[in-house]
Amino acid sequence: MVTTAGAFNVPLKCTPEETKHFVEPAMREAEGSNFTGALEVVNDGLNAHPASEGLLFLRSYFCYKIADSISSELSALPKPIQPLAEGVLMVDGAMTNQMLGRFQEIVKVLGDAEEAINEILQVNPHNNEVTAFRAYIDSKLQKLGQESENMRMTFTNTPNIAGNFCVGCRKNISFDTQTVVFRKTSSTQLEVWHLPCFKQLGNKN
């Protein structure tokens, strides 16, 4: 049993060989926040020792850390969909598309983490630490899935209601690449504007 220093307090069931050749090098990568490099080392170890509980747990942990890093990057960015006033919503199409793609990356990596955990639980179903970690990852996946779905629904449904032409300049709108503003004009109707056209409207008023 080996306890990893400074990362988490879960005992790892690894042989001395696994510890020397894979766990210790992976933890050195992780100490420098290179979780992708750490995961590569662990995956190499699992190619040689596919049933190692310790390496499987490290795989799930480093997948989680990669997902967490992407999530932190996204939280530092401006929100791609944000209200400007009552009944007015600004949508940055390019950033929304980018963020939806990054959400998918996070979901995939967390799915890989969950898969590694499930492999451990097949061998050792009463491992409380691993069971708790799986519950945590499941809750993360559920939250991300809801956020992604809400963003996708706003992004895809709103243009269907508002149409494809800017009220200001009457030119076509590319929702995938342009920043646009939706303005509610009644309980069932929406206007859509290019952001510069909407700003011009504000300057006139």
Residue spans of the language-model regions?
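Cys/His-coordinated zinc-finger cores
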Residues: 192-203
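Short cysteine-rich clusters marking metal-coordination/redox-active sites
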Residues: 166-170, 194
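Alpha-helical segment of the N-proximal tetratricopeptide repeat
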Residues: 15-44, 48, 93, 100-101
